[in-house]
Structure formats: C-alpha cells, structure tokens
A protein has these predicted regions:
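Rossmann-fold NAD(P)-binding glycine/threonine-rich loop
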Residues: 98-120
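N-terminal Rossmann NAD(P)H-binding glycine-rich loop of SDR-like oxidoreductase domains
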Residues: 4-24
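C-terminal helical cap and adjacent loop that interface with cofactors, partners, or active-site loops
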Residues: 272-352
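N-terminal Rossmann-fold cofactor-binding loop
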Residues: 31-35, 53-54
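Conserved Rossmann-fold cofactor-binding substructure of NAD(P)-dependent oxidoreductases
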Residues: 51-67, 72-80
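Active-site-lining helix/loop region of Rossmann-like oxidoreductase modules
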Residues: 7, 142-289, 293-296, 306
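Conserved beta-strand positions in the Rossmann-like core of class I SAM-dependent methyltransferases
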Residues: 5, 29-30, 96
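Rossmann-fold NAD(P) dinucleotide-binding segment
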Residues: 62-66, 78-97
C-alpha cells in the first residue's frame, strides 16, 4: 500500500493531481466510489486502486490503515470532509484536501483538538483555495505585526471544473461573509467593491467582496481579526451578483438545485491543457493598522488548476516526509508564507 491515498482521483482536479503524483514517483493509491472510472485510470497510470464510498467506514479504515496521508479531492467538501476526517482520526492518517468552502474550514477547525490528541494533521485548502492567498496574508501580516485588518483579492483566468461548479450550486444560498472582530458575519454577496492594482499591467482592476475561504483561514494563520476577501470581476457582473441575491431563495429549492447540478454535468468540463498552460493567476494583499499604517504585497502565479496541482503535491510530500504539525492547520500556518514561492513561476513583490 502506498503512503498516499488520493480520494476522488478521477474527477477533473483529482485526475490532474493523480497524473502528476504518478509522474513524480509518489505512487499514489487511487480511491473513490466509481469502480469503472478507477479501473480505467489505474490501468492508464499503473497505480493500485480501492473502491470505497464514504458511507463505508470499515472499508475506509482498511484503505487508510497503511497510509501516511490522504488527499481528498472529492467535492462538494461539505458532504465529504466529515466521514474522511473521522476515518483519519481513527486510523491516525494525515488529512489534506483542496476545498475552498469557508464552512468546511470552520468545521474542520473544530476538530483540531481531537486531531492533536490523535497525532494527526488536518490541513484543508491545499490548492489555489487557499495556498496563495493564505501565504500572502501571512506575508503582509509579518510585514506589519500590529495590523488589525486584512484585505485580500485575486484574479483568475480560467473556466471551472464540474466539481467546482457543483460546489458553487451547493452554496448558492449562502450569501457573503466577512470576519469582523474575530467573528464571521453574514453579509449580502458583493456587498463591497473597490479597485486593486494587481501589478504586471493589471492596475485599476474592479473587485467585489466574496466569501472566499480566507475569511476563515486568514484569521487562524495571522490572528488579524478583520478580514475581507475579493474577486476581480467587471462592474456589470457585480450588479448581476447583487441582483441574484434577490432570487437565492428560489435557487436553493431542491428541484431547482437538482436541475442546475444536472445542467453542470452535461455542459461543464474544465479548462483544457492549453488553457492551463497559458493562464495566470494574481493575488493582492493589504494589511492595515488601527492608526492607518498599511503595507501592500502581491504575487503572480500559474493558472489556478496548474497551481493547485503543485501546491497540493508539495504539501502532501511534506506530510509524507514527516513534516506534519498535528491538529488543525492552514497552509501558511504549517509551512510559512514562503510555501507558495516553491511553485515554479510564482513571483511576489512588496509594493508599499
């Protein structure tokens, strides 16, 4: 049995990760509930595979019993984190995933004491959600230790995979969220907007507030009590987001949600190899003190899915090598703000 289990290895992102892990000699065990998909993938990659659903705890324990770490790539993570984390606690297996779901970060954080007692690391969010933003949050907070406010923004050039689109539908009625005085507060979606200079020719970019995972994680990484996260989008898109908030009760009805999930299954595939090769991502971070002192830093990196593969495998390799601080962790909390600089093509610069 390999030291690394990749669960949900045949989804869009899971496939990219499984392929890269195999190419780099990690020899992962591929796992999930769909036998036909696993058989085909395992034959192509030359890997072992295990068919196991998350509602089969005894089988799941057997799959994880000889593993050092599991990388959960099966979303929506609101449905998958709990049975997998429970299995990790029972089998003393380190847990990593690629979620960006704020509520999932909070829920896994609540298991931190149990994980520490079991000698297990719980490290959600090891993809684009939230490694680059978490690392930049840690960096600007390190530059300004007395900061009491963090603002983070990102710009991504990509389509989305089926799994990401389904997760968006799963949370369509969640609205927005910010952290104020250390507590997460619900707010209307896109309730704030501003312009940001992402650098590299992308100045004056319009961004709007969204409930990115860093609303949860940045506080645990830095201790800064006020956090707002933004995504680049045209002003027209912001207006549509705000208008959509008026119909979210309709969108959250089970028949409507089921219809949206079906439509995604029929129409969404994710960026192709050329798009992943050419695309770039940008992150901007600002830390501010109560008396107005501020610092600004930013970074540029590969396409979001390409970056996810790199950061997921970098953190998994650290765990496999024994560098796995126990309890709940964030990427930069576990491995420092320079973790992201280990990804080829990432540049970081301090602006203010």
């Amino acid at each position: 049995m390999s030291d690394l289990v990749v669960y949900g290895s045949y989804g869009y992102t899971g496939t990219l990760i499984a392929e890269a892990a195999t190419e780099r000699g990690l020899d992962p065990v591929l796992a999930g509930r769909e036998r036909r998909s696993l058989e085909s993938q395992a034959a192509r990659l030359g890997c072992e595979f295990e068919v196991v659903a998350l509602d089969e705890p005894k089988v799941l324990d057997m799959v994880l019993s000889d593993a050092t770490a599991v990388l959960n790539c099966a979303g929506p993570f609101a449905r998958t984190w709990k049975p997998m984390v429970e299995a990790c606690l029972r089998t003393e297996t380190h847990y990593l995933d690629i979620t960006g779901e704020r509520t999932v970060f909070e829920a896994i954080h609540d298991q931190g004491d149990r994980a520490a007692d079991a000698g297990v690391m719980l490290l959600p969010g090891v993809g684009f959600d939230v490694v680059p933003t978490d690392c930049l949050a840690a960096h600007v907070a390190q530059r300004l230790p007395d900061a009491d406010r963090l603002e983070l923004a990102f710009r991504a050039e990509n389509g989305v995979s089926r799994g990401t689109a389904k997760t968006m539908v799963e949370h369509v009625d969640g609205g927005g969220a910010v952290r104020r005085d250390g507590r997460i507060e619900r707010v209307p979606i896109a309730h704030e907007s501003r312009t940001v200079d992402f650098g590299w020719g992308l100045d004056g970019q319009h961004v709007a507030a969204i409930p990115w995972g860093d609303v949860a994680t940045a506080y645990y990484t830095t201790g800064v009590p006020n956090v707002t996260t933004y995504m680049a989008m045209p002003e027209r898109a912001v207006q549509l987001q705000r208008a959509a908030g008026l119909v979210t009760p309709l969108l959250s009805l089970p028949p409507v949600r089921t219809g949206l999930q079906w439509l995604i299954e029929q129409t969404t595939e994710g960026p192709d190899a050329d798009e992943r090769e050419r695309g770039e991502s940008y992150v901007w971070g600002e830390a501010t003190t109560a008396d107005g002192e501020r610092v600004v830093s930013r970074l540029r990196g590969p396409h979001t899915y390409a970056l996810t593969v790199e950061t997921a495998l970098a953190t998994a390799r650290r765990a496999l090598d024994g560098d796995a601080p126990v309890g709940f962790q964030t990427p930069a909390g576990a491995y420092g703000p320079d973790l992201i600089l280990g990804v080829e093509g990432v540049e970081r610069e301090d602006v203010v």
